[in-house]
Amino acid sequence: MNRGITQKQYLGLVPPTEEDARSSQMRILDALKEKGITASFTLPALQKLYPICDEADYNITVSLAWNGSIWQVVDLEAGDTAAEHYGYAADLGSTTVVVRLVNCSDGTVLAEESEYNRQTAYGTDILTRIFACKDKPEVLQDIRACTMETFTLLFEKLRQKTGIAPSDVLSMVVSGNTTMIHFLLGLDPFCVFSSPYAVRADRVGFLPAKEMGFPMKGCVLSLIHISEP
C-alpha cells in the first residue's frame, strides 16, 4: 500500500497494567505493526511519550515520516488528529520560489505562495552565483542562507493565509535544477559548469528537515531536474 512519504495514524491503545507492562514505545510500535507498518522512534517523539500517552489515556495520533528506508515516528498528539495532515510542495527556481501547502489526506492544495529567490542578491543569473561562491565557502553559506530566508518568508505567508504553522507540517518535497539543489544543500555548484560535469550529488533523497534548518518534524525530499544546470 502506497502511503506517500508521511502518514498519520490514530491508535486507541490499552493502557499498561501489571499483566501487560509493555513500554509506551512498544505499545505504539506493536499497534503500528498490526497495521503493516514497521517503524522506529525519533528522539523528539520519544520525549513526548510522557505526558501525552497518560493524559490522553493512550488514545493518540502518531505522525510518521518515511526517511528513505523506514518509517519514523516523528510526533505524538492526544486524540484523533489524523485528518490534520499537511505537507509542502516546493519549486525552487533560480528567480522565483513557489511553495504549496497540501492537505495530504486528500491531496487538496490549501494555498500557494511565491517569492523572488533571495539568491538574486548574488546575481540575477545562475552563472554569476556559481562564480561568486567558487572556493568561497562563506559566500556559499550566505547564498544558502538567502535560500532558507526565502522559504521562511513563504512559510509565514502560508501560515497567515491558512493558520497552519510550519511546525504543524510533516515534510516537504522540493524540486529544482541541479544548481539550485546544490545551493539548498550548501554544496559548491561549480562542478555543474565545468568539465567533466560530475556533480557533487544527484540522488539526494530524504534528509531530516531539522538538519537542513527547516521547522518540519519529518524529512525533506529533494528532486533534481537532471537535464538542467
Listing of model-derived features with the role each one plays in the protein:
Residues D20-S23, P208, S227:
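Secondary-structure junction/capping motif
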Residues L221-P229:
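Residue-level detector of conserved catalytic or cofactor/ligand-binding positions
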Residues G93, G218-V220:
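Residues forming the flavin
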Residues M1-F183, F190-F193:
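N-terminal glycine/serine-rich phosphate-binding loop of ATP-dependent small-molecule kinases
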Residues D125, P196, R200, E228-P229:
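Generic signature of intrinsically disordered, low-complexity segments enriched in small/polar residues
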Residues F190-G218:
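Active-site phosphate-binding/coordination module
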